[in-house]
Amino acid sequence: MSCRDCTRKGGCVYTTFWLVRFLPVVLVSLATGWGIYAYTYELCILSIDNWPQRIIYLFIFYALLILFYTSYLRTVYTKAWKPPQKYCIEGASKATYESVKDDERQLQLFLSDIARERDLTLLVRGFDHGIRFCDKCCCIKPDRSHHCSMCEQCVLKFDHHCPWVNNCVNFGNYKYFILFLAYGFIFCIWIAATTLPSFIDFWRHEYDMNKKQYDSIDSVIQRNLKHLHTVLSNGRFPLVFLLFLSCMFSLSLSFLFFYHLYLTAKNRTTVESFRAPMIDGKYAKDAFNHGIRANYREIFGSHPLYWFLPVPSSIGDGCKFVMNDMTAMSAAAGNQVFVEMGNVPNGQSHAHPPIAQHHINLYSEQSSSASEKEIKSVDDEITERSQVSTATTASPSHDSVTA
């Protein structure tokens, strides 16, 4: 087997790399499994004697566990959404692409023709103000999509590639990702809050017992070491470690959770927060911001029943997005955007009169006919001038020949 075969899909190097990438998912699952044992047995069975309290603790624990781990699995196993087939260059179009790909101007003309023929909605432009194209996937990039080097494909509404879920966070699983962060944060807070009182009670009890044995001031260090040894040797180490893990994970999850709440409120992705999308030759960081309520509805859906459940309810198809009114008017003022007024899809609400769709087509019917008329008038003028110039030049020559 050659080195090239090893690096291909199914090869030994590729398989090893895939297993390493999946390691964080295994670690999260192992930590969750160990937490189930520690909370159920070490805390609820060994440390809590009150049956009603034990039942309440276990009921809330397992309810949060189901919501947390289901959201996590949906985030992990929901495949990243690819651009639809109509954005891809295939067949005869592929041959044309191969012939013009080295000439940027011809390539943009070719992509513009494809976008017009297939009625593609393209609001976001590249830094060169041209249509964004992925030469690896050989497809026109839909708005807000990007190529993921880890997944080796273009991904719709790409947010980031998260190693802890071994998947791209994108349009297809962004709701699950936020629910995973939310329930993970609440889950860890609940574990820490319910473990801490039992741990403190046990610590104080053992400390008082050791204090009677070591009363002299000179034996303070010895008393504390004995106390720590008692705590660990009496089976309390799982409780200590559970408290430590829950505090650590709740702290780390809180940063991610509240950051993505902010991004959702602004209708931005992580990529867009660092590099604003370019629309009409300008960076528009709030191009898709329609207000907090509408932005959250776009992610979680219109039905409150589905907001807190890891089930699909997001609005849209991941390709077409609605610009806010200010961005649309700014773009229209530059005569580069053609705006079609209508109803906001899927029940989205806005503070201002809604704009349902904004099409940027370099070769729309209106612009094409206007360009053709302008070109025809210029051609007629050039023809007229050339005829006059020819007649003027030819007259003296004719007179001299006659003479």
From Swiss-Prot:
TM spans (from-to): 17-37, 55-75, 176-196, 239-259
Record-annotated DHHC domain positions: 132-182
Gene that produces this protein: dhhc-4
Keyword Transmembrane: yes
A single BP term in Gene Ontology: synaptic vesicle maturation
PANTHER family reported in the protein's UniProt record: PALMITOYLTRANSFERASE ZDHHC16
Localization annotation: Membrane
GO molecular function annotation: protein-cysteine S-palmitoyltransferase activity
A single Gene Ontology CC term: membrane
Name of the protein in question: Zinc finger DHHC domain-containing protein 4
KW Lipoprotein (keyword) present: yes
Region annotation Disordered: where it falls in the sequence: 365-403
Coiled-coil boundaries: none
Keywords: Acyltransferase, Lipoprotein, Membrane, Palmitate, Transferase, Transmembrane, Transmembrane helix
One Pfam family matching this protein: DHHC
Biased segments, Polar residues type: 385-403
Membrane protein topology class: Multi-pass membrane protein
